[in-house]
Amino acid sequence: MDNYKILLDHETIQKRVKELGEEITRDYQCKEPVVICMLKGAVYFFADLTKNIKLPLMIDFARLSSYRSGTTSGQMELIYDITAKIEGRDVILVEDIVDSGKTLKYFIELLNKRNPTSVKVCAFLDKKERREVDIKVDYAGFDIPCGFVIGYGMDYAEKYRELPFLAEVINPPKA
């Protein structure tokens, strides 16, 4: 795909991820939060972020989907659930992008049934303009406008996640 415009280069991304790690480290002093990576998109951000959090962490993974091959299906599906016991624990959900907020809201409601002390959200990208439900992003990497993005974990039909930068696709192909 050659029809894209770079929005964030690798250095800019890494600088912001380091700042987020420092902020989370300050906020969770003397605690050992459970940090949950929302697969697949957040894996690059999650790996870089957790290296910059200078605390003991318990990490886990979940995969919840409402997307199929670049399109939205609108149906929530829990594909892979966490294995950590989170009752009485502080939880940080790490997301690649918060768009409508529906998927995240659904997962937070599932987690809250397990009685964590707190659930906070750390997202690489926040698309506030597209929010359809009331979801607070506690730690946001970057606010971005509407547009289809690839790179640094974001994909189009499972491709382009490995790009070290974030780019907006110009005239994305129709799925």
List the predicted regions and their residue ranges.
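PRPP-associated nucleotide enzymes
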Residues: 1-175
